[in-house]
């Protein structure tokens, strides 16, 4: 356990650290990538260029320091991060690298304010948190390896089918090269693609599993990512998957990870899934798995897209609507093309609104799951809050660094 002295010091310096948190995290990544270039491949460089990773880490540090006297409230965040760490192959030996560079970055930014007493307290606090992560991640690794067909590290898969879902989304159907069994996954989980690219070392990328959990294959559905900011590169791995990977090619995959999941066998109330853009992928897996396990389940699926050209899984959503007597779907285009509305390709034009959720879902009783781009997520979260939906009935997933939805 942490000493009372360490807790007191960390609480005292929290305002100062919070005021400089993003400066500290930017310096941290600069130092670490220079001193330990071997860890650079763990990090999505698009998120580095956009500043999203630095902002997310700054938020995590501030949250830990704020709640250092009651770390139990951080356990949901610990689970999310531990799952992500396992997906990337983070091991106990990586934690000292992070710790030493973080302490050095704090010293660089805070200068003389980072007294030996403060550095010692932050070091103890970091070590305490690192031990929590190492323990949880070890349990996840063990669980993955012990499943029928399970594995740690990477396993070679073959692309058995490649399907264009829209102008910007392509699906890849994957089976093990060794023809061995596939371990079960929880609807909503993701797998990690480990891929070499001419402009970067082997780069792990997480992609949600987008098909029913009962299928004899894994399916990922990849959006062709464009640069997030002017000087950043386009998504290297997503573009390589679209342009360079064909049926018959081999891909190295990590096992399923992730805590944004649903258990179809235990559903006891209506489920509402609200998807924006490529955020449809984990929710489609949830929907198909729920209906497969219980055809009479009450399910409401709202899918938002720009227009019919970029609307992925339109046919699958129509089939889903016919899969059970209590399945209800709605498609909303915010920038419909001429004919999209008239030809029935979408049900409504505009954005997801509080009124739409009120009128088309049992919002007073349902559990809500939503996923999509940050502005979409902020809007949906705000709508649910205005409708009085209890937070314990709301689950959501960001693609990329997880950030606060409530405050800009």
Curated annotation (Swiss-Prot):
This is Flavohemoprotein. The lineage of its organism: Bacteria, Pseudomonadati, Planctomycetota, Planctomycetia, Pirellulales. Residues 1-138 form the Globin domain. PANTHER family: FLAVOHEMOPROTEIN. It is an enzyme of class 1 (oxidoreductase). The record marks 84, 397 as: Influences the redox potential of the prosthetic heme and FAD groups. Residues 152-263 form the FAD-binding FR-type domain. NADP(+) binds at residues 277-282. It comes from Rhodopirellula baltica (strain DSM 10527 / NCIMB 13988 / SH1). Its cofactor is heme b; FAD. Keywords: FAD, Flavoprotein, Heme, Iron, Metal-binding, NAD, NADP, Oxidoreductase, Oxygen transport, Transport. One of its GO terms (cellular component) is cytoplasm. Belongs to the globin family. Two-domain flavohemoproteins subfamily. In the C-terminal section; belongs to the flavoprotein pyridine nucleotide cytochrome reductase family. SUPFAM superfamilies: Ferredoxin reductase-like, C-terminal NADP-linked domain, Globin-like, Riboflavin synthase domain-like.
């Amino acid at each position: 356990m942490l000493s009372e002295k360490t807790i007191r010091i960390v609480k005292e310096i929290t305002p100062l650290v919070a005021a400089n948190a993003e400066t500290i995290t930017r310096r941290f990544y600069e130092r670490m990538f220079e001193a330990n270039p071997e860890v650079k491949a763990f990090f999505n460089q698009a998120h580095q260029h956009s500043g999203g990773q630095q902002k997310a880490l700054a938020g995590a540090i501030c949250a830990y320091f704020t709640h250092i006297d009651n770390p139990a409230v951080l356990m949901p965040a610990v689970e999310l991060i531990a799952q992500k760490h396992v997906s990337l192959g983070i091991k106990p030996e990586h934690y000292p690298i992070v710790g030493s560079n973080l302490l050095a970055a704090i010293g660089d930014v805070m200068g003389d304010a980072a007294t030996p007493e403060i550095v010692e307290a932050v070091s103890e606090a970091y070590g305490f948190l690192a031990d929590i992560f190492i323990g949880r991640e070890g349990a996840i690794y063990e669980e993955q390896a012990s499943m029928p067909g399970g594995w740690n590290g990477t396993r070679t898969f073959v692309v058995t089918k490649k399907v264009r879902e829209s102008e910007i989304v392509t699906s890849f159907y994957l089976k093990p090269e060794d023809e061995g069994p596939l371990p079960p996954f929880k609807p909503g989980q993701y797998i990690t693609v480990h891929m070499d690219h001419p402009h970067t070392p082997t780069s792990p990328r997480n992609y949600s599993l987008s098909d029913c959990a009962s299928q004899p294959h894994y399916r990922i559905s990849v959006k062709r990512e464009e640069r997030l900011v002017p000087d950043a590169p386009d998504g290297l791995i997503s573009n390589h998957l679209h342009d360079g990977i064909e049926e018959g090619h081999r891909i190295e995959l990590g096992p399923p990870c992730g805590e944004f999941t649903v258990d179809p066998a235990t559903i006891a109330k209506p489920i509402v899934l609200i998807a924006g853009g490529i955020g449809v992928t984990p929710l489609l897996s949830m929907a198909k798995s729920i209906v497969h396990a219980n055809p009479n389940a009450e399910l409401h699926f709202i899918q938002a897209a720009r227009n019919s050209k970029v609307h992925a899984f339109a046919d699958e959503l129509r089939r889903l609507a016919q899969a059970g007597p209590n399945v209800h779907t709605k498609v909303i285009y915010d920038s419909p093309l001429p004919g999209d509305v008239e030809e029935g390709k979408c049900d409504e034009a505009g954005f997801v609104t509080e009124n739409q959720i009120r009128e088309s879902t049992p919002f007073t009783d349902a559990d809500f799951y939503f996923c999509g781009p940050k502005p979409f997520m902020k809007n949906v979260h705000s709508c649910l809050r205005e409708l009085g939906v209890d937070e314990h009935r709301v689950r959501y997933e960001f693609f990329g660094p997880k950030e606060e939805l409530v405050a800009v």
